[in-house]
Amino acid sequence: NLRCKFCQNGVISQEGYGKPITPRRLREIFEELVEQGAACLDLVTPTHFTDAVLEALGDGPWPVPVVWNCGGYESVETLKRLENRVQVYLPDLKYALTEPAKAYSGAADYPEAAKAAILEMFRQTGPYRMENGQLKSGVLIRHLVLPGELENTKAVIDWVAETFRPGDVLFSLMSQYTPQPGAEGKLARRVTKAEYRAAERYMA
């Protein structure tokens, strides 16, 4: 929903892929997934469908965790509506610096908005809880290392380390950036092994 220049799911997010369904049908899909043994209800980039999702979820609780899988650019007001409905938050923290946020996502306020959103997510869930190797509640912050943007990655790592204590949240440092058709400048190449290793060393 940010239309990032490096979006890995452009067909879905920007080309109208999908079909309309009602909140009633969405609830039926949730129920079918649970009956089939799904470990969670994973809602991917659901923010612009918040009203429909909340209607479909009802008052709950569901027998499996409800997962809010998002890009991090969320409003605190919307997140507050999800309290006690969502057990697991999977936000991206794409940027901690304004310059790449503006250049690649047209959202200079992304760092401020995403940090506030993640703090609200953590307020709701508290420290993460694992059960039989599965995340049952909590916040898992993801960060995709971008080519030539190691300083941004370091700033993300710094904020997470300074904001949370060990055991509060999970953090995933991702390396799978793939240049999209028409990518230019820094985004025209993959992340090098040296860049990713440097990010790992900094995180350690």
Model-derived regions, located:
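Canonical Radical SAM [4Fe-4S] cluster-binding loop centered on the CxxxCxxC motif
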Residues: 1-20
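A cross-taxonomic marker for long C-terminal extensions/tails that follow the last structured domain
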Residues: 194-204
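Conserved AdoMet/S-adenosylmethionine-binding subsite of the radical SAM
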Residues: 30-185
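Electropositive phosphate-/nucleotide-binding environments in soluble metabolic enzymes
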Residues: 20-23, 150, 154, 193
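Short cysteine/histidine-rich metal-coordination sites, predominantly Zn2+-binding motifs
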Residues: 17-29
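Acceptor-substrate binding/catalytic loop of class I
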Residues: 186-191
